[in-house]
């Protein structure tokens, strides 16, 4: 059985598309912290997309993303995502920081946060080097991505990079 998100110590945010019946204006945070995500643009809900569970689909359009209040002490993140081959989006974005900056590989060697670059990154349980592993081909199928950072990082969006165009998630 699935854990009650509120029982997990230190949980800041839990967005679970399988709970959704529509891509409404807000996405409820299951952590109990009230970090609900506001929909911007037209991300869509795809019902029964994976083992009867719903997903949210993003087109890569500059207006399509979800945003919540800044969380600036992020240490461990889990995603279930799929990237389309044309994806230019970050795994997480922010209104002012670019800690999750990529450059075709998971992490940009100069622009991503050293706390992200030096962290422990896994895709489907396999440890990978985020500085040399191609992101889009690694995430061509729905995948579980985990990251444990070496220090605090900040994010407030999935997934839009500050106000830079062409850096929104394209995939699920």
Question: What name fits each language-model region?
Answer:
Residues 2-3, 44-46, 135, 165:
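Short, flexible coil/linker segments at or flanking structured domains
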Residues 2-31:
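Extracellular carbohydrate-recognition regions
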Residues 5-11, 65-77, 133-143, 167-172:
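Extracellular/lumenal carbohydrate-interaction signature centered on repeated Trp-anchored short motifs
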Residues 7, 12, 19, 44, ...:
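Acidic/proline-rich low-complexity IDRs
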Residues 16-18, 82, 95, 148-150, ...:
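Active-site-proximal beta-strand/loop segments in catalytic clefts of secreted hydrolases
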Residues 22-27, 31-120, 153-156, 167-168:
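Extracellular glycan-recognition modules
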Residues 121-130, 135-166:
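Carbohydrate-binding surfaces in secreted/extracellular proteins
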